[in-house]
């Protein structure tokens, strides 16, 4: 047995009937035969010293202890620039470009005849990969070089799901169709290797090849038929993908909403400071005016002092009334509801950003001012003509926006919590990879790229 590989103890047999299961061929020549554990066949010595060869039943999962050399070679062969859109790819490479000695059987009965690199990115799959040649006795090895998320492989009419991990290799007869179900998070990179009988095997075990030819074709034809189990699992993995994508998109949305909330609150905090500054300025101006009058006519001091206090109260009363009416109008206005109706929604997997009609907002608040100023105290029109009008307008809009964003954040969080609960362990096992994808997409939003 190759010291760089070991058979997986928990996952080694599909339980499916195999044509090799019925074929036992005997020879009496032990010369140059190595009795070694391998994933393709088993050699059994009988009491009469004859040797029996029993081909693989179903499929075998083995673990390759060290694939760094293979991974380094593959990385050099992959395209330097990756596509920005999710995709799949299959790249055929020369059979001698990568060291694959860990797939040797010990007797040189099988040689590498074809090598491909498969790439599957988040949200994509590769179904019905067919490597069968009529009458062949080939094996297929699918080695997982990289999987930064969840990747499941199923063989046609074999109910077992193989959740692939780095360094694990699935080996089976070539008459099985290969299905890589929807990739969830990140990407997976596989090395697909076809192993064909060597000349030595064809000479020594020709009867095995002959006896398997018809059975292999029979199984291949069966595997071409629709597989309800695979369709069911394919749909399940797609549903998992959609739920994970929902979490990712809404996580990005939450970060966006939190940023907008912070900015809006900070803006209103600044406006509050400007209100206070304006009050102080008005008070100072009135005091200054009263002092000038008092200097001219000391007798009027008491009367003017009362006038100053009355003016200050009147200005404060006017400002507070205007502010209260503006905010009340903003909170209850159907017009503003329509203006803010585009904040933000998910359409076909993408976030539709804020698209406020600023002119409509301005016109709305102007109408609010004119509608209410007739019932306000004297001085309202002077305030309306000043910069305070714009501050009130923005402040009212922001107060409504803050309430809207907080409600939206709450709804999004509830939806995400429900999805996370449904996913259970799948979410827990992939949480780090999900957070990584969220960070990458947030950076794309910041840089102005599309999701």
Curated annotation (Swiss-Prot):
Residues 1-20 are annotated as: Disordered. It holds the Pfam family Pox_F11. Coiled coil: none annotated. It comes from the Viruses. Residues 1-12 have a biased composition (Basic and acidic residues). InterPro entries: Poxvirus_F11. Belongs to the poxviridae F11 protein family. Stimulates increases in peripheral microtubule dynamics and may increase the motility of the infected cells, contributing to cell-to-cell spread of the virus. This is Protein F11 homolog. It comes from Fowlpox virus (strain NVSL).
């Amino acid at each position: 047995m190759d010291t760089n590989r070991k058979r997986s103890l928990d996952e080694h047999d599909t339980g499916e009937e195999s044509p090799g299961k019925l074929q036992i061929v005997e020879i009496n020549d032990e010369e140059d035969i190595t009795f070694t554990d391998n994933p393709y066949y088993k050699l059994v010595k009988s009491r009469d010293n004859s040797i029996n060869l029993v081909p693989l039943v179903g499929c075998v999962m083995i673990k390759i202890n060290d694939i760094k050399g293979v991974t380094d070679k593959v990385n050099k062969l992959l395209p330097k620039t990756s596509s920005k859109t999710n995709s799949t790819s299959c790249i055929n490479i020369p059979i001698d470009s990568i060291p694959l000695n860990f797939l040797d059987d010990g007797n040189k009965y099988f040689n590498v005849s074809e090598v491909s690199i498969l790439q599957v990115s988040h949200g994509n799959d590769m179904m019905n990969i067919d490597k069968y040649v009529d009458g062949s006795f080939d094996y297929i090895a699918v080695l997982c070089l990289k999987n930064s998320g969840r990747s499941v492989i199923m063989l046609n009419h074999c109910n077992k799901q193989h959740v692939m991990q780095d360094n694990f290799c699935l080996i089976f007869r070539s008459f099985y169709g290969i299905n890589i179900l929807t990739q969830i998070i990140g990407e997976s990179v596989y090395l697909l290797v076809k192993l064909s009988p060597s000349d030595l095997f064809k000479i020594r075990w020709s009867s095995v090849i002959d006896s398997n030819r018809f059975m292999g074709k029979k199984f291949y034809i069966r595997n071409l038929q629709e597989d309800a189990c695979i369709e069911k699992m394919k749909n399940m993995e797609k549903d998992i993908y959609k739920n994970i994508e929902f979490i990712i998109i809404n996580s990005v949305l939450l970060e966006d909403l939190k940023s907008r909330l912070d900015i809006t609150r900070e803006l209103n905090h600044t406006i509050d400071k400007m209100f206070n500054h304006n009050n102080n300025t008005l008070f100072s101006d009135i005091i200054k005016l009263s002092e000038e009058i008092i200097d001219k006519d000391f007798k009027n001091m008491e009367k003017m002092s009362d006038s100053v206090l009355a003016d200050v109260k009147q200005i404060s009363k006017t400002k507070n009334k205007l502010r209260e009416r503006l905010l009340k109008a903003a909170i209850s206005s159907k017009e503003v509801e329509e203006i803010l109706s585009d904040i933000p929604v998910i359409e076909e997997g993408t976030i539709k950003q804020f698209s406020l009609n600023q002119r409509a907002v301005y016109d709305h608040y102007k109408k609010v001012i004119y509608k209410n100023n007739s019932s306000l105290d004297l001085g309202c029109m002077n305030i309306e003509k000043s910069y305070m009008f714009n501050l009130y307008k923005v402040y009212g809009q922001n107060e409504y926006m803050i309430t809207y964003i907080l409600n939206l954040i709450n709804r999004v969080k509830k939806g995400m919590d429900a999805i996370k609960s449904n996913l259970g362990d799948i979410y827990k096992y992939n949480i780090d990879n999900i957070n990584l994808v969220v960070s990458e997409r947030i950076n794309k939003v910041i840089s102005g790229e599309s999701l």
